[in-house]
Every structure is written in C-alpha cells, then in structure tokens.
C-alpha cells in the first residue's frame, strides 16, 4: 500500500511539473503582445504601435506634433512613458509643451526617450555590469540617460535632473527596434 501511494505521489507530482506553462511570447520575436491592454504588433513600427495604443494616448498626442517621425526610423530603442507616467507630471506640463512656441522642447523631449540601435534588456544589464553598476546611454537628443539595477532587480533609468523611472515592460519587439514601457517621463535639462 505504501509503495502504491508513493508511486501515485510521484506520478502526480511529475504531471504537475510537466503541466506548468510559461509565457514564451515575451522572448520570441514575431508574436503580438498585449502591453497593459495595448496590442503591440511586432510587424509594425514603434510609431505605428504607440499611435494605435490607448495606453499611450498622451505620448501619441505629443508624437503627432513631430513632423520628423522620430520613432519611425530604424533601428531604435524607445523608452515610452505610458499615460500613468504623464499623469505624474505637474498639471499643465503637457499642454504647455504642445504650444507652438515650445515645439523645439517637445521634439527634444521625444528624442530624449530614444537611443539609436536595438538595445535589449540583456544588453543594458551587461553594460551596467561592465560599468560597475551604471551604464550611460546617449539619446537621440544628444543628452544622456543613466541605467542601474535597483534592489528589486528592476532596471532604473535616471535623467539629467536626477528623476528616476523604472522600466515596467521589457523588450517589446517592433519592426524598427525595441520598446520599453517606463513609469516616469524622463526630463532632459532644458536650456533657455
């Protein structure tokens, strides 16, 4: 009886082990991903996916002011603040940036969220290790962002003003690069 019980226990446990599933869509390029309720199609550009995503409507409104289509070039890595990130800015900030007089600042802000080349989270982590805990990236605006890994193993970006943003979604493959979702808007130093 004990042997039968032991046998059934082993069979049951091994069935549980083999029955577990993981979401492999995050690691396989070419799969459509749901990013916080927004569908990201890897056959579309970063710009196309952001403009079609309700979770990025604030970023979309800013991007519509960009006649150069910064996020449609190839290859790029974009750190995209979602609507929650923009809601953390002081009231009126986005409306002020959308004024015609602030168009250069607006474009600078967009460029500050993009880096040339396809940079995976593994690449970022390797650069952080090689940099003794910090990695510096030059954005399309010519300004820098610093990356580190915090105590919770999250990649944290620090802007030129000391503001920090956690990367909440990693390695969202797009036709022209990689998109990351971030929790705060990164702000470059604005020079008058």
Model-derived regions, located:
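Bacterial Sec-dependent N-terminal signal peptides
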Residues: 1-24
């Amino acid at each position: 009886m004990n042997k039968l019980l032991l046998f059934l226990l082993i069979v049951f446990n091994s069935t549980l082990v083999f029955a577990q599933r993981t979401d492999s869509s995050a690691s396989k390029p070419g799969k459509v991903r749901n990013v916080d309720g927004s569908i990201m199609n890897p056959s579309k550009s970063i710009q196309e996916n952001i403009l079609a995503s309700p979770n990025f409507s604030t970023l979309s409104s800013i991007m519509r002011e960009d006649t150069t289509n910064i996020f449609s070039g190839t290859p790029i890595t974009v750190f995209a603040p979602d609507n929650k990130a923009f809601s953390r800015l002081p009231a009126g900030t986005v409306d002020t940036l959308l004024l015609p007089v602030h168009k250069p600042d607006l474009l600078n802000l967009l460029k500050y969220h993009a880096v040339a080349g396809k940079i995976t989270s593994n690449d970022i982590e390797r650069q952080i290790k090689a940099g003794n805990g910090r990695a510096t990236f030059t954005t399309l605006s010519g300004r820098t962002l610093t990356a580190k890994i915090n105590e919770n193993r999250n990649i944290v970006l620090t802007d030129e003003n000391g503001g920090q943003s956690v990367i909440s979604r990693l390695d969202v493959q797009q036709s022209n690069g990689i998109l990351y979702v971030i929790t705060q808007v990164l702000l470059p130093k604005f020079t008058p």
